[in-house]
Amino acid sequence: MKEIVLAGGCFWGVEEYMSRIKGIVETKVGYANGIKENPSYEEVCSGTTGHAEACYIKYDESIISLEELLNKFWSIIDPTVLNKQGNDRGTQYRTGIFYLDQKDLNVIIKSKSQEQKNYRKPIVTEVEPLKCFYEAEEYHQKYLKKNPGGYCHIHLD
């Protein structure tokens, strides 16, 4: 099994979208690559902790490759917009690919480079090693499964 953490705006939609993909075996939402240890949702929303709302993904690479997974990720975000996805604004809504395995970096860079060909503006999606990931509060986990029709900036149909 492989792992990656993806930030694509509000984590509810990213988790719901990713959880529907064959080969993804586990998802969790949380706060990635900030400066405060174990922040609350309210603290992250204040914009002072440096965290991105993100989705931890465990996947079976014999079913879905990292390249395929990233192609799906690119399809649900606007990677040229800084600190905004859909109606959500703030540093916590930035886009990012946070890797746990250094060996994944070449695939990520190649994927980002390929995706850049689809845009005139530069892609601003962060590509960094995962420095920290704090699981979000329970009510955020599988939020759109528990609350069908809840807010989502991603078209899930």
Swiss-Prot record:
Pfam families: PMSR. This is Peptide methionine sulfoxide reductase MsrA. The active site is at 10. One of its GO terms (cellular component) is cytoplasm. The gene is msrA. It comes from the Bacteria. It catalyses: L-methionyl-[protein] + [thioredoxin]-disulfide + H2O = L-methionyl-(S)-S-oxide-[protein] + [thioredoxin]-dithiol; [thioredoxin]-disulfide + L-methionine + H2O = L-methionine (S)-S-oxide + [thioredoxin]-dithiol. It is an enzyme of class 1 (oxidoreductase). It comes from Clostridium botulinum (strain Okra / Type B1).
